[in-house]
Amino acid sequence: SFAQRLNTILEPEVLEASNGLEVCAGRVIIAHGSHHLTFRRDGTAIRCILSDSAPVNRHRPSVDVMFDAITAVKPAQELVAVMLTGMGCDGASAMKRLHQSGTRTVVQDETSSVVWGMPGAVVDIGAADHVLPLDKIATCMLDLAK
């Protein structure tokens, strides 16, 4: 799976989202290929919830759905949102809402993007705090999370 391949090149643990999986420090969670990724609070924990609801902007999973869902369980000011290479504009409108609510936003630059669609859409609507090459994004995320 994609998560298994990422585990061979990334230091943090990479898991594909599953119902009830806890979101925690040091863990990278990627959306399942056929379900929206949403979240629920379980006491002090935040857990993944998979949804097979209708596609949003023709996408399932949808970045817009995921970004909107996280603010229901975590204050926007405590989040760092990142948009990497991708086709289309999925996630841009939700990233703008996050940005307007105080979330720090990071976007992959055009030079290092295979497809500039999704990150370019975020830049075009003025929702990017940082536009960086792929190899600089992890360090920026760690700095912003402090």
PLM region spans:
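Conserved acid/base catalytic micro-environments in cytosolic active-site loops
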Residues: 1-146
